[in-house]
Amino acid sequence: MAGGEQSGRCSRARFLTRLSVGILASAATAVPASGAEPAAGTASSRPWKGRTISKVKRWDVITIGNLSRNRYWGENDAKGVRSAICTCTVVQGEGFRLIVDPSLANAEEMSKELDRRTGLQPRDITAAFITHEHGDHWFGLAHFSEARWLAAPDVAAALNKTNKLPKSVESATDRLFDDLEIIPTPGHTLSHHSMRFDCEGMSVVLAGDSVPTRDFWRERRGYYNCVDFELSAKTMDRIASLADVVVPGHDNYFLNPLK
């Protein structure tokens, strides 16, 4: 790999080592670098939910998102103070390279971040999946013109009605590429869908805005524009039952349960 720093790879030993020394919260590196096996009594003793056999070989966070306003930082729900960017992830496996929620509207920036985190170019991406219809989760979709564009049926219909995309988004249900599960996660929007997969024995959920950030997750609270707060809390409980790793819509990934 070009450059002196390894891309973030879903190696369980490396992942757990960084957790054990408290580096997970760092926004500088989205996925583990390298290190020794974790010591006894660390996160390695957790019972993992994922399967060790999976077509998914690696996953990389491309952009770590942020909210336009964050009540847990003392900001008012009624007023945005910055532009929102969503967390974007690439999942690679046997026969596919999938990007989830491409977030950057600027083509040069999107290409640069993709290369910086994976060494890939937009033309290398074979498919894109969008969790829901809010624009900050698909503003970068058009940069992946050679990929298949996919979303749950109601999300695909909403995206196609915008008339802002150069081609149609296809409906996808249940599963992609055998081992990527599309799971309904309503609350933020009623049609919201997340993605779950196994990688090296860990179950990973790309939550989208069903989990805005780790603070919202901890409080089981939806974002200010959530359409159903009670349903959102139930959805987070469901994700908790499925995931070892949660990738939220506007934050770095974290381990479940969150300590």
Go through each PLM region and give its residues.
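Zn-dependent metallo-beta-lactamase
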Residues: 8-28, 32-95, 234, 238-245, ...
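Beta-strand-turn-beta hairpins that frame and shape the catalytic cleft
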Residues: 54-59, 92-97, 174-181, 199-203
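Active-site HxH/HxHxD metal-binding segment of metal-dependent hydrolases
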Residues: 79, 83-84, 97, 102-175
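Soluble or luminal CAZymes and related metallo-dependent hydrolases
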Residues: 83, 106-109, 187, 227-235
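Active-site neighborhood of phospho(di)ester-bond hydrolases with catalytic His/Asp-centered motifs
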Residues: 100-103, 126-134, 150-152, 184-187, ...
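A mid-sequence, solvent-exposed acidic-amphipathic segment
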Residues: 169-191
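Metallo-beta-lactamase
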Residues: 192-259
